Amino acid sequence: MSKIKGNVKWFNESKGFGFITPEDGSKDVFVHFSAIQSNGFKTLSEGQSVEFEITEGAKGPSAANVISL
């Protein structure tokens, strides 16, 4: 799988999910906190730069292996 760069559109800490806007202008991608590769509390900030892979989830594309840049 190839890595894609993007920016966090929004992320709801209490619900544990949000969306990432890919740099290539493609459709926003769903992200769940379990896909975030970090130690401690897994969260993302609006506008944060990230790198991720896309997998096909039950409800469409979702981000996997999300790394903060």
Swiss-Prot record:
GO terms for molecular function: DNA binding. It is found in: Cytoplasm. The keyword Protein transport does not apply. Disulfide bonds: none annotated. PROSITE patterns: CSD_1, CSD_2. Residues 6-66 form the CSD domain. InterPro entries: Cold_shock_CspA, Cold_shock_domain, CSD, CSD_CS, CSP_DNA-bd, NA-bd_OB-fold. SUPFAM superfamilies: Nucleic acid-binding proteins. GO terms for cellular component: cytosol. CDD domains: CSP_CDS. The keyword Transcription applies. Keywords: Activator, Cytoplasm, DNA-binding, Transcription, Transcription regulation. It comes from the Bacteria. This is Cold shock-like protein CspE. The gene is cspE.
